[in-house]
Regions:
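Terminal alpha-helical segments
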Residues: 1-327
Length: 327
């Protein structure tokens, strides 16, 4: 099944191509990121759209490196979590299912965060000190008191009327951090689906995924994590083998099948829910790795982030670098 086709090509053209015109290195990640450019007031203009919502104008050379910095920070977290998750399970086949699912979830969560940055959007949390700085910067430009929301989201788009200019739509989030991420990821999936050819295998697969997200909720990975981690009966379910480690639910070359075979009217038990979680998040993981490979290819060289990570590790992490096309 061809999972990455015309819809995927749209994402590559719309987002990865402009991102590939810029580069950030490992040493610059602490200051080339979205929070820093907002704290330092590096926008050229700002407009208050509504309460706590702002349209900020940036030069391309400022905002794209900051966005890449955010993306690599999320990617590093995903890589560390993936490495720990993948190496733990083979060593401990009786690894607690509850903790396996939770550990796998955080790997998926940071992959999802990486995908958002690759598609020029993201979730952002401002602690009180950061919030105060940004409020002051915006208020100074606008001439009266303004404030950003503690939990916010942003979308960055090219201004097609002015060369080298990007606009950030910074607005309050209606959800907490994890919920926000999964709702935003569903929007990315919707964009890929909308640009897929009507009768393509990619569209069929994404139609099935859309049904899963509609029935179980966009936020179902986080709901699963919360249930197995906090609800006491899931300890008994683990002992009685009614839930399994996330890694045990992988279906080799047919890993997308739980999504393709999903029936909206049938009851979805815990085991099926974990299978769907694994299939969905593996799709996101492959999508992210593909897009990063596309970025490196378009940019003309690898980022150097992976080698910088391994420079500080006694046991190197293995990074996927080949793009993936078929299920």
């Amino acid at each position: 099944m061809l999972l990455f086709d015309k819809g995927y090509a749209h994402i590559k053209q719309e987002y990865i191509t402009p991102l590939s015109q810029q580069h950030v290195n490992y040493r610059s990640l602490n200051y080339k990121n979205i929070k820093t450019v907002l704290c330092e007031g590096k926008f050229t203009s700002v407009e208050c759209v509504s309460k706590n919502r702002y349209s900020l104008t940036f030069d391309e050379d400022i905002i794209i490196p900051a966005l890449l910095g955010d993306m690599w920070l999320c990617y590093i977290r995903a890589c560390l979590q993936r490495d720990a998750t993948q190496k733990t399970y083979p060593l401990y086949p009786n690894f607690c299912p509850n903790w396996s699912i939770v550990s796998d979830y955080y790997y998926a969560f940071y992959s999802a965060c990486t995908l958002l940055r690759l598609t020029m959007r993201g979730n952002i949390y401002f602690d009180s000190a950061v919030q105060k700085k940004i409020n002051m910067n915006i208020s100074t430009v606008l001439g009266d008191a303004h404030a950003v929301s503690e939990n916010s989201t942003y979308v960055i788009q090219k201004d097609h009327t002015r060369s080298g200019i990007y606009i950030m739509d910074l607005k309050p989030s209606n959800h907490q951090t994890h919920e926000t991420v999964w709702h935003e990821v569903a929007a990315v999936i919707g964009e890929i689906r909308a640009n897929a050819s009507a009768r393509s295998e990619e569209r069929v697969a994404l139609d099935c995924l859309d049904t899963v997200l509609h029935v179980l909720d966009n936020n179902f990975p986080s709901k699963l994590r919360n249930a197995v981690n906090y609800q006491l009966p899931y300890g008994i379910k683990a002992i009685e083998r009614k839930i399994y480690p996330a890694q045990a639910c992988q279906l080799c070359n047919k890993w997308f099948d739980p999504i393709l075979s999903f029936e909206a009217k049938k009851k979805c038990d815990d085991f099926k829910r974990v299978q769907l979680f694994k299939a969905y998040t593996k799709y996101l993981d492959i999508l992210v790795n593909n897009l990063i490979a596309e970025y490196n290819d378009l940019h003309g060289r690898k980022s150097g982030i992976e080698s910088a990570i391994n420079k500080h590790r006694s046991i190197p992490i293995e990074f996927p670098d080949a793009t993936y096309t078929y299920q």
